[in-house]
Amino acid sequence: MSDRNPLIDADRRADEDNTLRPQTLDDFVGQAAARANLKVFIEAAKVRGEALDHVLFVGPPGLGKTTLAQIMAKELGVNFRSTSGPVIAKAGDLAALLTNLEERDVLFIDEIHRLSPAVEEILYPAMEDFQLDLIIGEGPAARSVKIDLAKFTLVAATTRLGLLTTPLRDRFGIPVRLNFYTVEELEYIVRRGARIMQMGISSDGAREVARRSRGTPRIAGRLLRRVRDFALVAGADIIDRRIADEALSRLEVDNRGLDQLDRRYLNIIARNFGGGPVGIETIAAGLSEPRDAIEDIIEPYLIQQGFLQRTPRGRVLTAVAWQHLGLPAPAEIIQQSQYGLFMEDE
């Protein structure tokens, strides 16, 4: 009989995705400021012999939130337990997780913004006082029971900071925002991945994959694996720029890292709504994609690259987007661009 807890993803998957993950903070590429601060906080916690304060990672998907949480547990020399907000359906699920933690263990909750209010209420005293306040029974026979917990570290991740309630957000002593990676950082990650895969790659080949990876290591790893497949079938011993370009073009990833869905998004606003402003619900209906996916996956990179601007009236394409689509921009967009009203996010 298996004693595996379905709430905890304890599978040791030997796939390439995990093989490519860095194992220490020194191996982790990018997020220099965040890594430097985490090193200090981890070392201080070890010196004090106490649990690390609770950590909240904020940023788009694929930037390394889960990997950093695993590395933190390893550097602290403690156990790592992982789950996600949607999986914790009721208070009893969370209680089962928390009561099985040992002193200073790391519990990672991905998508913490998707916790139900009832579960979130249980989490407050657990984070602050390391106690569970449970109601046993119903009606007049109901009674409150307090259960002491081991002093643990909650590491949480969210792509939607605004959806976290203030009481929950304020209980994280170490908030960490993760940003998109530079092409240089991704190029290093791609070259490292190719070495692990035992596949040769040239500098310009690695750079071609890197600059089409949307500033995201997870996407860089995925694209590298697909480019490797094209190279192997073509009988190439090394991935050069030509092979990378041909493979990525066949995958419909353009020279700015935009895929078919990104271009559909831009084209809907450009062709159907004259460049905007247009509301997110209208765009979601046009794409047949959920609003959350658009706001979490598509829009952050488009905004960061200067293709899109959010305004109180809706989404508006910038002159950069019109140029990328090969369409003539409306006169007012050109004027606004000249006056610097559409600027790329820093």
From Swiss-Prot:
Residue segments, region Small ATPAse domain (RuvB-S): 182-252
Residues in the signal sequence: none
Keyword Cytoplasm attached: yes
Compartment list: Cytoplasm
GO molecular function: ATP binding; ATP hydrolysis activity; four-way junction DNA binding; four-way junction helicase activity
Annotated residues for binding of Mg(2+): T66
Catalytic activity of the protein: ATP + H2O = ADP + phosphate + H(+)
Ligand binding (ATP): L20, R21, G62, K65, T66, T67, E128, D129, F130, R171, Y181, R218
GO cellular component, one term: cytoplasm
Pfam families from the UniProt entry: AAA_lid_4, RuvB_C, RuvB_N
Large ATPase domain (RuvB-L), as annotated region: 1-181
Job description of the protein: The RuvA-RuvB-RuvC complex processes Holliday junction (HJ) DNA during genetic recombination and DNA repair, while the RuvA-RuvB complex plays an important role in the rescue of blocked DNA replication forks via replication fork reversal (RFR). RuvA specifically binds to HJ cruciform DNA, conferring on it an open structure. The RuvB hexamer acts as an ATP-dependent pump, pulling dsDNA into and through the RuvAB complex. RuvB forms 2 homohexamers on either side of HJ DNA bound by 1 or 2 RuvA tetramers; 4 subunits per hexamer contact DNA at a time.
Family: Belongs to the RuvB family.
Domain free text: Has 3 domains, the large (RuvB-L) and small ATPase (RuvB-S) domains and the C-terminal head (RuvB-H) domain. The head domain binds DNA, while the ATPase domains jointly bind ATP, ADP or are empty depending on the state of the subunit in the translocation cycle. During a single DNA translocation step the structure of each domain remains the same, but their relative positions change.
Subunit structure: Homohexamer. Forms an RuvA(8)-RuvB(12)-Holliday junction (HJ) complex. HJ DNA is sandwiched between 2 RuvA tetramers; dsDNA enters through RuvA and exits via RuvB. An RuvB hexamer assembles on each DNA strand where it exits the tetramer. Each RuvB hexamer is contacted by two RuvA subunits (via domain III) on 2 adjacent RuvB subunits; this complex drives branch migration. In the full resolvosome a probable DNA-RuvA(4)-RuvB(12)-RuvC(2) complex forms which resolves the HJ.
Descriptive protein name: Holliday junction branch migration complex subunit RuvB
Organism name: Brucella canis (strain ATCC 23365 / NCTC 10854 / RM-666)
